Amino acid sequence: RCCGYKMCHPC
């Protein structure tokens, strides 16, 4: 999952 701008990590 991507959170923010081009920052993909488990949220």
Swiss-Prot record:
Protein keywords: Disulfide bond, Hydroxylation, Neurotoxin, Secreted, Toxin
Entry protein name: Chi-conotoxin-like Ar1311
4-hydroxyproline: residues carrying this PTM: 10
Domain comment (free text): The cysteine framework is X (CC-CX[hydroxyPro]C).
Subcellular location: Secreted
GO cellular component terms given for this protein: extracellular region
Described purpose of this protein according to its UniProt entry: Chi-conotoxins inhibit the neuronal noradrenaline transporter (NET/SLC6A2).
Sequence similarity: Belongs to the conotoxin T superfamily.
Tissues expressing this chain: Expressed by the venom duct.
Disulfide bonds: 2-11, 3-8
Record-level Gene Ontology MF annotations: toxin activity
